[in-house]
């Protein structure tokens, strides 16, 4: 399943915006590492609690039956009552440490089962509960205490063997009918406790796995928000140390908000951030619509690349369409003071190198002469225009209308002939210009 990128903040019915999903995801991820162990312990405690209450029901039922029928003597009923009370307080012992509650439960169960089996004989089936305890002991003490669990299971096996060889099938303490009833009830209740406990443990584990899957999806969304999907997948490969790719053809765009410094100094911080969030979120939607890749945002500068990391033959045309839509979207916006938001946009094309750099807060970036030229096209551009060099003009002239600006001096490149991108040609009439179609893009 593809991870969804964090986009524009959801818009409520009253026009207000909620915090973007990515902020919530970051907060959740920050809490997640400290929760996993605690949740594992809590699951084990819940399993022990449900097992203890099932045991209370079983031992309490036996005590009531023995008191009502008088079969087995009052002290057998007393053992069951004492055992049921002890089981009932087991959930209260979790606060004293991870092993106090399970060891109290298991120890009490072992003593009670052995005492009853010794008094009434093996035909009553009390020893079956030892087998249930051996099967459930890992769930109760935890997998991190495997050696202890094995030891407790061995004790259960030893007690079963001891009863078999040391105690007669029927000691005569209970009448034959009571022994038969005890055997049936013991068999049914032992199976019931085992099935119920395992079912509850598996259900709790399934819920925990669903939570982990949701956390994984949030992690994937955060990673997809930082890196292109294909790059993110390559970054997960354990043998991959460096990600660096050369592209013989790609197009680069830089856009800058004109007069941003003055706006920032005269606008409240919260209003400025909300404005930039709306603007850049709208641009992000356009990037996705055109199948491009946003590289970075630096203050009021927005950088987009086409043909990276997925090469495409129409990379220049796609970026030109995006530039026209971008200026159209910006024209629909007003800053917090109600002023228009003019842009300067520059495009360039050529070979580039792209890769992931940094060991902390790593990022995906693009380098090359085309990047430098696109930046110069933006910085030397006129307000509200999209400036391109001659190489871009040659690629766009058949499908777009461009107006020559002339020759300008570009730092590091000398004199360059540049053009203004006006719009896309209409197929029916090459002389007619079609500007960018109006797009709201969530603004």
From Swiss-Prot:
Transmembrane segments: 47-69, 74-93, 98-120, 124-143, 148-167, 180-202
Molecular function GO terms recorded: adenylate cyclase activity; ATP binding; guanylate cyclase activity; magnesium ion binding; manganese ion binding; peptide receptor activity
Cofactor remark from the record: Binds 1 Mg(2+) ion per subunit. Is also active with manganese ions (in vitro).
Keyword flag Lyase: yes
Organism per entry: Mycobacterium tuberculosis (strain ATCC 25618 / H37Rv)
Class of this enzyme: lyase
Protein name: Adenylate cyclase
InterPro entries reported for this sequence: A/G_cyclase, A/G_cyclase_CS, Cyclic_nucleotide_synthase, MASE7, Nucleotide_cyclase
Record text on subunit structure and interactions: Homodimer. Can also exist as monomer.
């Amino acid at each position: 399943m593809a991870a969804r990128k964090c986009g524009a903040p959801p818009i409520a019915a009253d026009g207000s915006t909620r915090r973007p999903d990515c902020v919530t995801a970051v907060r959740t991820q920050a809490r997640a590492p400290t929760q996993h162990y605690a949740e594992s312990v809590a699951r084990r405690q819940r399993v022990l609690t449900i097992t203890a209450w099932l045991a209370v029901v079983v031992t309490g039922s036996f005590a009531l039956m023995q008191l009502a029928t008088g079969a087995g003597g009052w002290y057998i009923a007393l053992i069951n009552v004492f055992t049921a009370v002890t089981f009932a307080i087991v959930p209260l012992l979790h606060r004293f440490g991870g092993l106090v509650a399970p060891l109290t439960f298991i120890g009490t169960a072992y003593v009670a089962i052995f005492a009853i089996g010794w008094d009434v004989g093996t035909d009553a089936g009390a020893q079956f509960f030892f087998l249930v305890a051996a099967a459930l002991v890992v769930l109760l003490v935890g997998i991190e205490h495997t050696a202890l669990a094995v030891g407790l299971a061995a004790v259960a096996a030893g007690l079963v063997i001891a009863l078999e060889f040391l105690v007669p099938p029927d000691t005569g303490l209970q009448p034959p009918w009571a022994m038969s009833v005890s055997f049936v009830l013991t068999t049914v209740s032992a199976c019931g406790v085992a099935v119920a406990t395992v079912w509850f443990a598996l259900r709790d584990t399934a819920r925990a796995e669903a939570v982990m899957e949701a956390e994984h999806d949030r992690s994937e969304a955060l990673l997809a928000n930082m890196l292109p999907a294909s790059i993110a997948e390559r970054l997960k490969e354990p043998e991959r140390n460096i990600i660096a790719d050369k592209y013989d053809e790609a197009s680069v765009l830089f856009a800058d908000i004109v007069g941003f410094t003055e706006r920032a100094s005269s606008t409240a911080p919260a209003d400025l951030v909300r404005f930039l969030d709306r603007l850049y979120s709208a641009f992000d939607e356009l990037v996705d619509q055109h199948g491009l890749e946003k590289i970075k945002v630096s203050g009021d500068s927005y950088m987009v690349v086409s043909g990276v990391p997925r090469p495409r033959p129409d990379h220049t045309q796609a970026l030109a369409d995006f530039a026209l839509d971008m200026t159209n979207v910006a024209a629909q916006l007003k800053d917090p003071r109600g002023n228009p938001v003019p842009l300067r946009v520059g495009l360039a094309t050529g070979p580039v190198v792209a890769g992931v750099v940094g060991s902390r807060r790593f990022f995906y970036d693009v380098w090359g002469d085309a990047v430098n030229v696109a930046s110069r096209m933006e910085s030397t551009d006129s307000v509200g225009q999209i400036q391109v060099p001659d190489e871009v003009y040659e690629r766009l002239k058949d499908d777009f209308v461009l107006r020559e600006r002339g020759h300008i001096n570009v730092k590091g490149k000398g004199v360059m002939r540049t053009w203004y991108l006006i719009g896309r040609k209409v197929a029916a009439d090459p002389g007619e210009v079609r500007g960018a179609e109006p797009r709201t893009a969530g603004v």
